[in-house]
UniProtKB/Swiss-Prot annotation:
Belongs to the FGGY kinase family. This is Glycerol kinase. PANTHER family: GLYCEROL KINASE (PTHR10196:SF69), SUGAR KINASE (PTHR10196). One of its GO terms (cellular component) is cytosol. InterPro entries: ATPase_NBD (IPR043129), Carb_kinase_FGGY (IPR000577), Carb_kinase_FGGY_CS (IPR018483), FGGY_C (IPR018485), FGGY_N (IPR018484), Glycerol_kin (IPR005999). It is an enzyme of class 2 (transferase). PROSITE patterns: FGGY_KINASES_1 (PS00933), FGGY_KINASES_2 (PS00445).
Length: 505
């Protein structure tokens, strides 16, 4: 019998990838295309959904061709995606009525304020686990309905569909206007502000408060079941699509953090630390989000606490693209290594406000502690250290909420190739940092969810055996120095507050 594979589609913030995995969870081939980041105004971030769909089809072809396989060798397709990013499209034409509004976008602050006027930002938190914030999909849908000509009328008439990018890709992959499946999974639904964490269904009272017609919304399903088959014009025609997980939940799943008390931290455009709370819903007292971890078929859902950090890897991109301090993201480590320390400089990248644990939409970025002594090496180092400091603050919140101190941190994502950052991360946390052999845990998690649904993998134990340690960094900083640096970081964070006014965005 010839070997069989799983294809994972990873629709991310900066690119779309298709990755072919074998039974051991190893990567066989990858196809990848970046898409345009559209910034129409300060604080606005958009993607073109049609470009994302074109890229999805193309990267599938790239991956199959590189692996020298056809659809007959593929058992199932899994999808993982940038969460919260909202697409609204016409049910009849299949065309978006507006660009996708990206999770980092802050244009909906006035909508947040309006909804929070009655009950504060935690108005819906007991039901959905999330504060009112520009980050989540719900307010983005409202913005489109209120600002795109004819959108409200079409939505009321049942002519518009909403989805995060998993739903957009799934709908198109399964036929689009010709029988496309309009579904999302529990993890993505838990990021809209609309899903009841206990019933795992859309909450009609909340939809009424937002004035969003229920007819726009996809059906909520588990993270691991057959949703439909790929349509007939695709290179993957008739292959079942059998797994969907939001990117951070997918990375947790790919790290085999299946049990209560296990966690991972992903270093990507932003950083996302997820702590598995098992079948318990824990409402954070420390600025974390309560979210879905995963749900396999008809089994009980697993929940999680999440610390979301808006800007980490994208700070390095900004230094490359906007300042020209480095010509590639990888160069940041070399530049940072030209100095012994940060020279007293702290960089708080509150470009989209601050997410966990502060949730300050009025914050903006600040570079503090500058003197004539400081050079670009210090600034590069401060930019890397910002990622580690923000992670430490989120980990402190997780420890406080869970009552369990984490003993080591599993890491994944693009920035974990940066050894200087990983060592500083271990130093500032005071616990070891562990990198797995397969760093593409996001795509792997989606592959696992799909493979479980079709019997490609038997059970979670089967998946646990695939996880292997690649590298480990142990702390090498004394307690006094760690406390000094944390004190200065927290002082720097306070300097970013209260910047946004009516005439300052």
């Amino acid at each position: 019998m010839s070997e069989k594979y799983i294809v994972a589609i990873d629709q991310g913030t900066t690119s779309t990838r298709a990755i072919v995995f074998d039974h051991s969870g190893s990567i066989v081939s990858t196809g990848q295309l970046e898409h345009e980041q559209i910034f129409p105004r300060a604080g606005w971030v958009e993607h073109d959904p049609m470009e994302i769909w074109r890229n999805t089809r193309e990267v599938i072809g790239q991956a199959l061709s590189k692996a020298d396989i056809t659809r007959h060798d593929v058992e199932a397709v899994g999808i993982t995606n940038q969460r919260e990013t909202a697409v609204v499209w016409d049910r009849t034409t299949g065309k978006p009525v507006y660009n996708a509004i990206v999770w980092q976008d802050t244009r909906t602050q006035k909508i947040v304020d309006r909804l929070a006027a009655d009950g504060g930002v935690e108005r819906f938190k007991p039901t959905v686990g999330l504060p009112l914030a520009t980050y989540f999909s719900g307010t983005k849908i409202v913005w489109i309905l209120e600002n795109v000509d004819g959108a409200r009328e079409k939505a009321e008439a049942g002519e518009l569909m909403f989805g995060t990018t998993d739903t957009w890709v799934l709908w198109n992959l399964t036929g689009g206007t010709d029988g496309g499946v309009h579904v999302t999974d529990v993890t993505n639904a838990s990021r809209t502000l609309f899903m009841d964490l206990e019933t795992l269904q859309w909450d009609d009272e909340i939809l009424k408060a937002f004035d969003v017609p229920r007819s726009m919304l996809p059906e909520i399903k588990s993270s691991s079941e057959v949703y439909g088959q790929v349509e007939s014009s695709s290179l993957l025609r008739e292959v079942p699509i059998a797994g969907i997980l939001g990117d951070q939940q997918a990375a947790t799943f790919g790290q085999a953090a299946f049990d209560q008390g296990e966690s991972k931290n992903t270093y990507g455009t932003g950083n996302f630390l997820i702590f598995n709370t098992g079948t318990d819903i824990i409402h954070s007292q420390n600025g974390l989000l309560t979210t879905l971890g995963y749900k396999l078929g008809d089994q009980e859902p697993h929940y999680a606490l999440e610390g979301s950090i808006a800007v980490t890897g994208s700070l390095v991109q900004w230094m490359r693209d906007n300042l020209g301090l480095v010509s590639s993201a990888a160069e940041i480590e070399t530049l940072a290594a030209t100095v012994e320390d940060n020279g007293g400089v702290y960089f708080v990248p509150a470009f989209s406000g601050l997410f966990a644990p502060y949730w300050r939409s009025d914050a903006r970025g600040a570079l503090v502690g500058l003197t004539r002594y400081v050079n670009k090496g210090h600034i590069a180092r401060a930019a890397l250290e910002a990622t580690a400091f923000q992670t430490r603050e989120v980990l402190d919140a997780v420890n406080a909420d869970s009552g369990v101190d984490l003993t080591e941190l599993k890491v994944d994502g693009g920035m974990i190739a940066n050894n200087l950052l990983m060592q500083f991360q271990a130093d500032i946390l005071g616990v070891p940092v562990v990198r797995p052999v397969v760093a593409e845990t996001t795509a792997l998690g989606a592959a696992y969810a799909a493979g479980l649904a079709v019997g490609f993998w038997k059970d979670l134990d089967d998946l646990r055996q695939n996880w292997q340690e690649d590298s480990r960094w142990t702390p090498d900083m004394d307690d006094a120095e760690r406390e000094r640096q944390l004190r200065l970081w927290k002082k720097a964070v306070t300097k970013t507050f209260d910047w946004v006014d009516d005439d300052v965005q």
